[in-house]
């Protein structure tokens, strides 16, 4: 579930169904399905599926979800200007940070002098990073190079925030034993013909994640646009389609529920809207093993004035 409010300057927003750039934004919720896979590994527990130890409910971190979104955007927008990814594998962050200095013609050793000559240097650097990196524009970032240089742009708060995903019902992770015919060493090959291993699975689980989009922050800080928002929805719906692996082969986003407000700061608290969304087991189902075992509903009759519900 996401909350989005509308900003007067959402960049180049096209009209859809009578809405314009001045429209508000929505809250949204996503339903995430896991079938015989590991949705999120817990390094503190031997890489078993992450759970709340007191209740048994499954958890997936916001960091995991944002990683999937970043990977999707990088895949579909490969090489396209303005859609680079700041947090990525094998790329030191300060290398990307230095690009802003190069663009503005600033030597890293002379940042203090540049600050004296340019009062708005912080804003220029922030705008450069937001313009070029989609994930900074979306989620914000802590850019340590600028923090160390005592620039105010080192910490950017993004308009999009995600919560942990939590399973609708408690989960029962299973550890299964597997064998392989390949032997690791020649010495082992003389003693045995196979090797044993273990892996964790979750037979089935439906997870619910909630998130927020602030049009106010998008307008005032990062320039997150309507086109960026549409790409975010596309990424949430399809992020597992470009991330298949033996551990994640049947994971999918089942539905995205959006609460759209007609004012920039919103017409109702997010929690009241999220409470309108129910995911419940169907009558007679004791052990869910498919999405059809659940009924997902929204009490649209209870929507506050100025809030629209969109189901994707």
Regions picked out by a protein language model, each given a short descriptive name:
Residues 5-7, 20, 24:
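Short linear motifs in low-complexity or flexible loops
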Residues 22, 26-312:
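RNA-binding basic/glycine-rich loop and surface signature characteristic of RAMP-family CRISPR effectors
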Residues 7-8, 82:
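Low-complexity, intrinsically disordered short peptide segments enriched in small/polar/basic residues
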Residues 10-14:
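Hydrophobic alpha-helical signal/anchor motif
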